[in-house]
Amino acid sequence: MKNRKDYLKLLFLISLSVCLMFFINEHYIKADKKNPVISSTEPAVTPKKKTKTSDLPISAQLDVPLLYQFDEPSLYNGCEVTSLAMLIQFYGSTVTKNELADNLVSVPLMDDDGYMGNPNQAFVGDVSGNDSPGLGVYHGPIANLAKEYVGNENVLDSTGSDFTDVMAQVAAGNPVWIITTATFSPVDDFVTWETTTGKIDVTYSMHSVVVTGYDAESIYFNDPYGEKDASMDKKNFIAAFEQMGSQAISLFNN
């Protein structure tokens, strides 16, 4: 009797093992059909459409008016609005950097609860630099400000796109507002701020210029610090542009 019980027990365990092996094998076969790389934990990313370099002219150069952010009334922290004024004036407007600064939404550098301002939401601090320090502002508030002057349909915020798209706009006759760094190359002085919407990394080295041209080796730009068609080698300039989030705005004269 004991041998019979042992035999039945062994038979049961063998049957159970076979069933489990079949189930596991079937499960992974189905999973493999759905996910070609089972071990990957990275989410699927849709590749960005970008302009091919081969589709661009070898070089392009635009004559964009130069504005100096330190012309009185000076804007010590006003590189973003000064660059935007250059962009708008290129299409024939007489808007000034100070008018744009007056109409740009702003927040304190630090609020009463100790939270830092967020440049994605507004200009952080004092754009003039007369009353208090300031950091700057990112593409969102600048694009919204531009729309007030030229209309929604004439503003293209291409933030996140490849730099070849910036070059394509220049080749098409449209200068481009961008965020870069003061050295026009990557920097290592980022700090983390706690804002009301979460933590962000910022650098006081942020800067804004207008891309006016390019050729095989260099990018040309109007610098609101006072230089027209300044140049920088492509590699460093593009690396700084990407480090700052590939922020870019262009306008159309429809």
Question: Regions from the language model: what does each represent?
Answer:
Residues 7-140, 182-184, 189-192, 200-202:
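Active-site-adjacent structural segments surrounding the nucleophilic cysteine of cysteine proteases
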Residues 75, 80-84, 96, 100, ...:
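Stable alpha-helical elements in mature extracytoplasmic
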Residues 59-61, 175, 208, 218:
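A residue-level signal for beta-strand positions that form part of recognition/binding surfaces
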Residues 1-7:
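Short, Lys/Arg-rich N-terminal segment immediately upstream of the first membrane anchor
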